[in-house]
């Protein structure tokens, strides 16, 4: 039986793919509604999106056992790099002095340490949910119509990517059972507890290469490493209500995935402990049988 998801995901994403020339209303640009401060945040997001390059290299390296998922990376990588490109195209047209240099883009390409593939999958699923909400909030903040449309457009891509990752999580659940449940619940607890952390919990803001610490987050390699917190807290004002939406979306999807209702990170953590204890008992039993 063929259980590959890539062919179907390719068709569904291809059907809604937007055209950078035809679907972005470039002729509606209003220079009076774009400040230098806003243009700088667009530059930072363009560079951040470029980090899909090292993320893809990581995914392909750590998923050599899974050609279906690796093939899907071709679609994900294309669309994420397109996000970087459309933001750079906006700057090229309307703030050319702000276009990232090749050196600035290349700075975010560095090796990520190997990590458990299932945990990484869950981390990026949560990252897509978070980015969808960040971009929707950014679209609300901007009044210039073209960049507003761009953020709305790429936010929908991020939501679709999250949906695709969820399909692979369901497949992993069928193939790996409690091992997958434990991995997804572990990262889910971390991501659903973001309100208690100082820094935004997104893959681009996490340490991923011990040898390069502290310059081992994507954000630490940007021209302004402190921009993200300022963008979220002071500019687009991604407040508690927005954060609540992110957490609710994560818990809602895990409730469906695990067929058990979670309304708080604490409930999910209790489930994580149950599953971990179960997997440990199975592992102990296998050792005893040897």
Predicted regions and their residues:
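Non-heme di-metal
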Residues: 1-290
């Amino acid at each position: 039986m063929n259980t590959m998801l890539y062919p179907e995901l390719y068709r569904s994403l291809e059907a809604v793919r937007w055209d950078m020339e035809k679907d972005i209303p470039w002729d509606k640009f209003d220079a009076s509604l774009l400040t230098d401060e806003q243009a700088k945040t667009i530059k930072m997001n363009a560079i951040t999106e470029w980090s899909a390059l090292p993320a893809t290299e990581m995914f392909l390296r750590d998923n050599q056992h899974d050609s279906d998922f690796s093939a899907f990376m071709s679609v994900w990588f294309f669309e994420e790099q397109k996000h970087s490109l459309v933001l750079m195209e906006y700057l090229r047209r309307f703030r050319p002095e702000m276009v990232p240099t090749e050196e600035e883009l290349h700075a975010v390409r560095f090796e990520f340490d190997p990590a458990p593939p299932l945990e990484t999958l869950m981390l990026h699923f949560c990252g897509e949910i978070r980015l969808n909400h960040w971009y929707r909030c950014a679209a609300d903040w901007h009044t210039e119509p073209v960049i507003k449309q761009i953020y709305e457009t790429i936010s929908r891509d991020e939501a679709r990517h999250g949906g695709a990752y969820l399909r692979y999580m369901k497949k992993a659940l069928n193939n790996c059972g409690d091992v997958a449940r434990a991995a997804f619940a572990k990262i889910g607890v971390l991501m659903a507890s973001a309100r208690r952390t100082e820094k935004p919990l997104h893959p681009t803001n996490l340490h991923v290469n011990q040898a390069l610490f502290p310059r081992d987050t994507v954000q630490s390699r940007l021209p302004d490493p402190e921009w993200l917190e300022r963008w979220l807290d002071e500019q687009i004002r991604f407040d508690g209500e927005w954060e609540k939406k992110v957490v609710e979306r994560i818990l809602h999807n895990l409730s469906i995935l695990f067929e058990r209702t979670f309304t708080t990170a604490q409930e999910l953590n209790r489930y994580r402990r149950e599953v971990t204890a179960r997997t440990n008992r199975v592992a102990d039993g296998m050792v005893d049988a040897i």
